[in-house]
């Protein structure tokens, strides 16, 4: 799925501007909870219901995050998730300055909202439908290959056991 979603590498100036808006020029931390940042999270999800949402990997859709928050948030709406009782969400972890963090993220989105692209309109319906037909076919081939692999494992295990029994 991610193979069709473009990645736009940010410039140093764009990263600096993003960190400035988020109040992190001196110390980069998780935008959601304040813990040590270990990665960049897509503020708006790239994929939902096994389809691209239209958002891409660009600096305006990325914020510093810790692994706990990134994994817990997944592809949920960031604001709803922050205020939710989902495991490891800022609210469920008792983050004291949650409303300040929300305000900074809202300002970040106001200053440079993530770009949303209608993928099908951009590439045309023929290519789009062809891609998804190939995708469906590939998933079916992977399912069949997995069945074959299971059968191979079973037969090799049986051959192994037969050889061990013959040796005793």
Residue locations for each model-derived region?
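A generic signature of intrinsically disordered, low-complexity regions enriched in glycine/proline
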Residues: 45, 122, 150-152
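Domain-exit/linker segments immediately C-terminal to small folded modules
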Residues: 70-144
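Charged/polar, solvent-exposed surface patches and flexible loops
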Residues: 3, 17, 21, 80-84, ...
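Short, well-ordered helical secondary-structure segments
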Residues: 2, 27-31, 63-65, 69, ...
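Histidine-centered nuclease catalytic patch
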Residues: 29-67, 73-90
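A boundary/linker detector
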Residues: 1-13, 37, 131-168
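Short, charged surface segments at domain edges that flank catalytic/cofactor-binding sites
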Residues: 1-29, 50-51, 97-99, 103-108
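A generic structural signal for ordered alpha-helices
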Residues: 8-11, 21, 44, 59-60, ...
């Amino acid at each position: 799925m991610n193979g069709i979603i473009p990645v736009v590498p940010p410039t140093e100036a764009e990263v600096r501007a993003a960190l400035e808006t988020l109040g992190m020029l001196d110390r980069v931390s998780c935008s959601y909870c304040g813990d040590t940042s270990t990665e960049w999270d897509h503020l708006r999800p790239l994929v939902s219901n096994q389809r691209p949402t239209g958002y891409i990997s660009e600096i305006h859709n990325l914020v510093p995050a810790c692994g706990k928050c990134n994994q817990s948030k997944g592809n949920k709406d960031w604001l709803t998730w922050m205020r939710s009782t989902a495991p490891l969400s800022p609210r469920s972890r008792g983050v004291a300055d949650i409303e300040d963090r929300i305000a900074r993220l809202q300002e970040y989105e106001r200053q440079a909202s993530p770009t949303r692209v209608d993928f099908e309109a951009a590439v045309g319906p023929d290519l789009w439908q062809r891609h998804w037909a190939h995708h469906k076919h590939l998933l079916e081939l992977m399912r069949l290959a997995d069945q074959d692999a299971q059968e191979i494992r079973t037969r090799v295990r049986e051959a192994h056991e037969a050889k061990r029994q013959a040796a005793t």
